[in-house]
Amino acid sequence: LGRGSAAGSFILYLLGVTEIDSVKYDLFFERFVSKIRAKKTVIDGVTYLDGSLMCDIDMDVCYYRRKEVLRYLDEEFEGKTAKIRTLNTLSGKLVIKECGKTVEDKSETEMNRVSALIPKVFGKVMDISEAYEEVPEFKQWCDKNNRTFTNANKIKGLVKNKGVHPSAILLSYDNITKSCPLEFDSDKEIISSFNMDWSQMFNVKLDVLGLRTVSVVDQACKIIGIKVGDIDLNHESIYQSLYDLKHPQGIFQIEARAAYEACKKVKPKSLEEASAVLALARPGALAFVDQYANFTNNDVYEPIHPFFDDILGATGGVCLYQEQMMKMAHKVGFTLDEAELLRRIVGKKKVSEVKKWKKKIRDKIKENNLEKEVGDILWQVLEDSANYSFNKS
């Protein structure tokens, strides 16, 4: 049907790749592809674009039919497919821990404590150089134990072992031997010798994910004698079932405890409200479940500022989605590309970049003759929401 940022592409909807009308649901293409986010790599004088401009579309298929899909790709694109090599590197946490023990004979207990000071940002461990700038206690320890920190910086990122990507398939426009070196794995299957980043420069990466939930839906539709596309997503019986939900088992994502509890409070009556339940079932957003439920059940709206009512009104004054953050920045005067970049920078909390963008917001407020309070609220929402807001698509 459509899941992830690819659902923000109207072209994919028209092609039938997704069944989500991005215009109807107010989704942003810039959340899928953004010029500003693209990385540039120069090799032998030729500039290659990597990352954001390359479409990343995950495909969820029946768990028990995934091999069938892979076999189809191999046959349809004979000589043009391969699995993708992964290179697992030494993380900052690991090198700090091991260097401390070997270089300065620190205890396991102390190094466990020190490595725990390095935070995660968007699920990824922060680089130790960034942690040095951002975490005062970690900086203080590194200044006292400079040999450990210096050596850890030298070996971080080195390859420790290699593997195979669990879901990705490489697809070439021509015979794949022309675009990357290949090797065989232990099962005699073809794998790219390049890692994922290099392989994607010259080929397309497809993520084919086998989900048991898709298999359950497939079997249920076969038993009933319908297709998924036959289901009316606005039918009141769907939401009546969610309203009276007693057992969430088997309902994709809602079966998780946090989502189930949010669902019982919100009592969704539309696809938009059901989507909001999933967005609320995240660590930071759980604090807003009662506010949103009060909005859906009692029509109580808690505005943060009239300037943003048209953006946050549909979610009861709660900034649930990354697209809402982008809209707020856009309304202040930024382009949607800039708004996406701003969202990412605030989430990563890079001090130098944060200061720069704070000034840019102040400048936009003055340039467009807006109240200073509007800029303050925008920044506060960005800071509060960056770590929990959900991709609406």
Regions picked out by a protein language model, each given a short descriptive name:
Residues 1-393:
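Alpha-helical scaffold/interaction cores of sigma-54-like transcription cofactors
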